[in-house]
Amino acid sequence: KTPAGYEAMYASIDRLMVFKPGFFSCTYGAGGSTQGPTLDICSEIMRRHGVPVMAHLTCVGSTVADLTAWLDQARDRGIANIMALRGDPPQGQESFTKVEGGLGYANELVGLIPSGVPDFGIGVGGYPEVHQEAPNAAVDMDNLKRKVDAGADAVVTQLFYENTDFFRFRDQCAKAGITVPIVPGLLPIVNFPQVKRITSLCKARIPSELYEKLEASKDNPESTAAIGIRHAARQAEDLLKAGVPGVHFYVLNQSEATRKVLESLGMGRG
């Protein structure tokens, strides 16, 4: 959110270009707090590198008129891909509440977005370990099916650390008649306290064996990073062998861990 922060982000992107990424995704702050700059960032990434960017859009704090105006701006800037999410409650709120004149569900947002060429490609979130607010996996899958039926072109999953969770989720999607590509999302563990906070919020689990290794190395940042990167590399290799359409890395503006994961897989060597 500062000029220095933006330049650090662009530098991270520069370092990842050797791996020929298929796209970048760009979030914005809680409650849409950086919604405007998101469009600037997406435009700048495309200008610098010519790589597609998927801009995140949520229902939080926005009316239908707000969302439609934002989509018009995105289209005018050449942004062709949208990640449509309901969004998390703003800080200080325990549960999501739609604003007057707004939308309450991601499938409604998907339905609002003009899809298909020359409009937008639409991605939606999937939850291998079930969305934290869903009462069970069946309800969560019904919600995902509604998003896909509303016009989503692909599913990008929340982070996970056990590939069997993803494979089970992928099988459940197939049984539900979901045929769009399902892209797994990985976050290499470098900052263990940070990842513990994230997984606690989204109800994702860290396998006990991995957790114990990380806990034992918590006072040694280099060891922690090595463990996390090694685990992510094994995950990515296994997923690619299993035929996923690609892997979406949650870089969080810090490219070093993802770079090491990809290098360990033999990528980026020309």
Where do the protein language model's features map onto the residues?
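Active-site/ligand-binding-proximal alpha/beta "capping" segment
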Residues: G111-V156, R230-A242
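Active-site-adjacent beta->alpha loops and helix N-cap segments on the catalytic face
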Residues: G5-E7, G32-E44, T63-W70, P89-I113, ...
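Active-site mouth loops of central-metabolism enzymes
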Residues: K1-A8, V53-A65, G121-V139, E215-R230
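Conserved N-terminal beta1-alpha1 strand-loop-helix module at the mouth
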Residues: K1-C26
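Active-site pocket-lining/capping segments in soluble small-molecule metabolic enzymes
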Residues: E100-Y127, G177-I229, R234, S264-G270
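Active-site beta-loop-alpha junctions enriched in small/polar residues
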Residues: K1, T27-G31, H56-S62, G87-D88, ...
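Conserved beta-strand positions in the central sheet of alpha/beta enzyme cores
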Residues: S25, M83-A84, V156, H248
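Conserved, mostly hydrophobic/aromatic
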Residues: F24, A74, K147, G151, ...
